[in-house]
Amino acid sequence: MLVQDRAAPSPAKPPKSQIRELPTHQQIRRRFSEPKNLDFSTWFSENLSRIAVFSLLIVTIVAFFFLYNTTDTASLLCFQSQSTQFLQSLSRPQIKWNSIPVVPDKTSPYANFQTEKWIVVSVTKYPTEELKSLVKIRGWQVLAIGNSATPKDWSLKGSIFLSLDAQAELGYRVLDHLPYDSFVRKSVGYLFAIQHGAKKIYDADDRGEVIDGDLGKHFDVELVGLDSKQEPILQYSHENPNRTVVNPYIHFGQRSVWPRGLPLENVGEINHEEYYTEVFGGKQFIQQGISNGLPDVDSVFYFTRKTTLEAFDIRFDEHSPKVALPQGVMVPVNSFNTLYHSSAFWGLMLPVSVSSMASDVLRGYWGQRLLWELGGYVAVYPPTAHRFDRIEAYPFVEEKDLHVNVGRLIKFLLAWRSEKHSFFETVLDLSFAMAEEGFWTEQDLKFTAAWLQDLIAVGYQQPRLMSLELDRPRASIGHGDRKEFVPRKLPSVHLGVEETGTVSTEIGNLIRWRKNFGNVVLVMFCNGPVERTALEWRLLYGRIFKTVVILSSQKNSDLYVEEAKLDHIYKHLPKIFDRYSSAEGFLFVEDDTVLNYWNLLQADKSKIWTTDKVSKSWTSVKPTGNSDWFSVQAELVKKTVSTMPAHFQVNYKDATKNNHETLTVCSSEVFYVPKRLVTDFIDLVDLVGDMDLHYKVAVPMFFLSMDSPQNFDPVLGSMVYKRKSASFNTSSSLYSAKAPAVHPWSISSEQDFIKLVQQMAEGDPLLMELV
């Protein structure tokens, strides 16, 4: 459908919504003078030239629409034309909210079913593999909404399916307004879920797979209570009053990608934020997730940034923090990967009078503006789903309402005000104003009225209005309120265009390092004060590795520091191996050793890395008596080796040349265990059991039992290594950016960390951005 022009309000009924700086049709009509009272022949002769021009115009319009409806090329569809219509007055629905009875479900087989967490999807084809994975998410009920194209025998165990016939029996008012062949029939599903106890609704797509199969891991599913995080959230700055919309993909590392619904005039704004502010969590009632693979992009991007047979596989930074939108700044919101809390359920309504690919985007902007009336906000989350690009035709024509109107809509919404005193009246007021302005038609005004009445009928309680912050003087943002975060600039290597000029060498190196170590877990034991260093270590190494697990002799829940004993550190590692079972390997390092990760790229991640080639780290000791420490440890090694299975025992004895008189000791400040040997490592830990075997003895024993030293990767053999002395003090002359690692290096404060980063910047210049 084409977007309708704004209808003129009746002279007897002035508009009830207040719109700033937007001309009305009454003002437009006053520009024209009254027609003269002429007889037809005189009028015809005086206006012959005008009639000819007008006739030509009519023929042109008819020809254009004929071509428009018979041509499927993107170039023609870029041009938009709105049909000229007679101005018609709109009537605002009058609803008696207190007279709407609550109507429980008495007809469906699920009349007595109640649950709080729902996943609502529209289905046109038989169940996809992605949809089957959604059904497996624990604690969430999948609700599949059919349309006229859905197979009659559609079925998926674990889901609830509502066919067209089943939908019709529910008796909702919105059914009179919904098309039969569109995904916007999801509105029926939202009402059904609310009627059956929904408190959270995940608006999903049947080709999207939730990453790790856990919505609670990615979204803030709980906003109140013991399970809620109640933490400050990074927020875009509101300091620039001229900025009304942002591209969230920049925040998550993809500055050359833009979401469907972003005004095309804003596509070129690719600079990251100078600074952010913070907002307290708990009112992010609409949570927009980012999708890896095929993110929500518009047809302009889809057609111009890829070849026909190339599938998109775009990745975003999973480590970027979630980010909130302040009042006055908007963001595109879709129906593919979005979590709605009950306070925003009214905002799930999908408009029916606009093109299908514009429906959820218009809903998102409409909903954001109304959310401000409740003191709520939208937050955007790091990758929560993976959508697969099936290389299907992407209909530009279905987005025509976006490219023509979305920029104007945002300006309109920021200027719009309402004087209504209840929230549902305010919702209806905005829908009326949007119909007046031609963003949708009177059909959606009536649909809004039906939707709001259905919400009450299924038991939904309308929220209470709060004062709008937009009309208050904005507080100045002080230096202490500024929060810095520099997004990664991930190169879009998948794109059909070259981006050589936009991605610096440093960024390219970072991507290369991240690609190499992105599935390696770094385990760090902190001997120093974690209160002063834990966050810094995560900042330094978290850019490179899959995750950074920090251990210390004392637990610190606030900093996510786990308790472990260094003497028996190997006994703690199996827990971490199990937690990150998909990791490619595990790199252990103590905080007195610096990793120059750029020099580890050549190492084989399928082999053991250790310091067996570093003479001061890996030594053989001959015990001198029965009671000294080395003798005790040697006896424990003999006891362990005697219980080893044949393959371990043979490896160990071959490596030590069956010499029972010496004990292999390794300082073990840094070592790497590949995934293929994780099971062997765990088996050896189990063999040690409760014995008091020190890690400097256990780790080399494990490695010699697991594989031949000839197979160890020699990458750490060239590290800078000096033994600590009682008067040890870090010296800048010790550090070398050309070595794979440096030991020792003392870090006990933020200032020590800054000094280290300044040294490491020789190998990784981007580190200077951290200080």
Curated annotation (Swiss-Prot):
Residues 72-771 are lumenal. GO terms for biological process: plant-type cell wall cellulose biosynthetic process; regulation of plant-type cell wall cellulose biosynthetic process. The chain crosses the membrane at residues 51-71. Pfam families: STELLO. Keywords: Glycoprotein, Glycosyltransferase, Golgi apparatus, Membrane, Signal-anchor, Transferase, Transmembrane, Transmembrane helix. GO terms for cellular component: endosome; Golgi apparatus; Golgi membrane; trans-Golgi network. This is Probable glycosyltransferase STELLO1. It comes from Arabidopsis thaliana.
